Amino acid sequence: MLKPLCVVIGTTGAGKSDLAVQLAKRFGSQVINADSMQIYRGFDTITNKITVEEQENVHHRLMSFLNFDKEYSVPEFERDASRVIDEIHSQGKIPIVVGGTHYYLQSLLFEDTTLSAIDKLTNDSSPSKPPHPDSHILDDDPSAMLSYLKKIDPVMAEQWHPRDTRKIRRSLEIYFHTGRPPSEIYSEQKMKSSGSKLRYKSLIFWAFADSLVLMPRLDKRVDKMLSHGLVDEIKSMKSLAESEKFSPDFTRGIWQCIGFKEFMPWFEAPSDIVFNDCLERMKVSTRQYAKSQKKWIQSRFLPMCLAQQDLSPSSILFSTTNTTDLNNWEEQVEKACRVFQYFFYNGDAIAPSADDQHAFEKARDYLSIMNGRQSQKKKFVCEECLDKRGDPFTVIGEDAFNVHIKSRKHKTTVRRKKERAERQIRLKNIGILK
């Protein structure tokens, strides 16, 4: 019989931490952090940790324990979270896991997921094994890493955007650890994980807010962070990096947190104009992160949950918590508590709400195409358009490319190029241009 586990997911700023606290208070439990930035000791403001006051005397685990110069893998989280969950179960309580690092949660909930299995594969390499002779490429620039990946695994290279440094490096790490093309390993693990099993009897709450409300809310939160010592923390992080005499990698460890890299231009050219520009960049990055989290939930996490629900309805339940209107917060908390009570103690489930049904419908669409065409993983380059850096515009997936081709931006670019070419021909015809 599966032991119970409650999980609260959601985008940044949607109120998932507050919901987890209220559930823990109501049912006398503890909260386990599943945010990859909040595991680090210190830097409470830039990583948006819940304050001591906001915790309301609820014990929070796996938070603020890792030193800034360390990294924390998926298998390490899986191991530590499982240990804490067992400990809470031994006290007769139902653990509540909360966080926005969804690959942590996916690995914890489901056995043999692709991400978890591949991380274990690379972590299990013998310490005495000599490094790969080409592993120095991991410290090179993204274009060099991508060129190397194209040589050893062109299939994998086609799936990553040229500027997705983290994924390109990860693919190379897999190759250097295993000696095999990462696409081959991903394919094998995907076949194995297609039948992934639940580890726990799982109740999953998705705290969400309408984008028109969430985005301004996120902007205000960044402004609030500014008044709570954000700049001092960024200065402290920069000083730590300088004291250790290394250049921070913005794609790894604590250095990934939103705000650090965005404010680097201000240190190089301090002025009010540059500061305000950096602040705006941080707000944009925060909004983009929220969008990517929502996409992950809708297209990956929720479909996996629904697939399991189809197999075993009594083992997993997905429920939404709408935080758009904070005037209805107490009502939403009460709804979540009723769902918790019915699912874990009454052995039943409350009928899905309208928000639940809407989420399920979108997830069903994603579920039907989850293992769809390879063209959705292929890289497409537009020969007409340039991105913000002046590089050829690149997207992943045929559908995304078709959307771009039909966009006003693409059509305008093509029209202007055509008009310029026609103008040059006319000028040549009248002898102005040779």
UniProtKB/Swiss-Prot annotation:
Highest rank taxon of the organism: Eukaryota
Zn finger limits (Matrin-type): 380-416
Annotated positions for site Interaction with substrate tRNA: T101, Q189
Residues bound to ATP: G10, T11, T12, G13, A14, G15, K16, S17
Gene responsible for this protein: tit1
Role: Catalyzes the transfer of a dimethylallyl group onto the adenine at position 37 of both cytosolic and mitochondrial tRNAs, leading to the formation of N6-(dimethylallyl)adenosine (i(6)A).
Major location (coarse): mitochondrion
Region of interest called Interaction with isopentenylpyrophosphate transferase, as start-end residue ranges on this chain: 211-233
Keyword Iron: no
Cross-referenced NCBIfam families: miaA
GO molecular function, one term: ATP binding
GO terms classed as biological process: tRNA modification
Species in which this protein is naturally found: Schizosaccharomyces pombe (strain 972 / ATCC 24843) (Fission yeast)
EC numbers: 2.5.1.75
Keywords: ATP-binding, Cytoplasm, Metal-binding, Mitochondrion, Nucleotide-binding, Nucleus, Transferase, tRNA processing, Zinc, Zinc-finger
Catalytic reaction annotation: adenosine(37) in tRNA + dimethylallyl diphosphate = N(6)-dimethylallyladenosine(37) in tRNA + diphosphate
Family: Belongs to the IPP transferase family.
Localisation: Mitochondrion; Cytoplasm; Nucleus
Protein name as annotated: tRNA dimethylallyltransferase
Any one GO cellular component localisation term in the record: nucleolus
Record region (Interaction with substrate tRNA): 35-38, 166-170, 256-258, 281-299, 291-298
Binding-site positions, substrate: T12, G13, A14, G15, K16, S17
Taxonomic lineage of the native organism: Eukaryota, Fungi, Dikarya, Ascomycota, Taphrinomycotina
